[in-house]
A protein has these predicted regions:
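Polyanion-engaging groove/track-forming segments
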Residues: 1-222
Length: 222
């Protein structure tokens, strides 16, 4: 029992046969565990934040001027996005989803989306404004990361892992910006998406800890 064995974990290791189990294990560790060493990397593509940017690329690659309602619901419900719509204890994301369902909306224009929540129009703009150029896409993604970070910083100690995710994705988009400035072949959103995926699949999130102290978490090959 990890809760009871706080002072006797120096010789304890958790061995994971599947790297995808790492994040669920970290999220379920008792709060009393204050020393931890993780010796396995975690693929950046498997981090929850990756699914958000994949959804954004997919909706903006379509040429339609409106969005399918399920795509809108999935994005505003994303665990990294939904907290941005909390206002004075009110879940504005839920209110938007209710409007969509109550009015049986199938396709939703950008203007109508912005009308759902005037106080959150800056966030809606980051998510749903037209991605006209590669430069504007990269700027939007960087601003979105910063906006999410500002929200998480309000309770930093409880969001250390999520903030680490954001840092790594910020590095990734900075690298994309560097490649876009250095080379001239990234002309379309589809090309940018391909380069993004190539970088994403080559990166891992590496953790640091004290190798001689606390609970050890490792993969089968460690």
């Amino acid at each position: 029992n990890l809760k009871k064995e706080r002072n006797n974990l120096d010789n304890t290791a958790v061995v994971l046969g599947d790297e995808s189990l790492l994040i669920p294990v970290l999220n379920s560790l008792p709060e009393n565990i204050d020393a931890l060493n993780i010796t396995m990397g975690f693929p950046l593509k498997s981090i929850p934040l990756a699914s958000l940017f994949e959804q954004l690329f997919q909706i903006h690659k379509k040429t339609s001027s409106s969005f399918y309602y399920k795509d809108v619901v999935n994005i505003v419900s994303h665990p990294f996005i939904r907290p941005l719509f909390y206002e004075s204890g009110i879940d504005k994301a839920s209110e938007m989803i209710d409007i969509i369902h109550e009015n049986n909306l199938i396709y939703i224009s950008r203007d109508r989306l912005k009308g759902f929540s005037k106080t959150n129009d800056n966030i809606l703009a980051l998510l749903f404004d037209d991605w006209n150029t590669v430069d504007s896409i990269l700027e939007n993604c960087s601003q979105l990361i910063l906006t999410i970070k500002n929200g998480l910083d309000k309770n930093k100690t409880s969001n250390l892992l999520s903030l680490e995710y954001l840092f790594r994705f910020n590095v990734l988009f900075n690298e994309l910006s560097h490649l876009n400035s250095k080379y001239s072949h990234i002309k379309t959103i589809s090309t940018l998406h391909d380069v993004y995926k190539e970088l994403l699949h080559s990166e891992t999130l590496d953790f640091q800890g004290e190798p001689l102290q606390g609970l050890q978490i490792m993969g089968m090959l460690e």
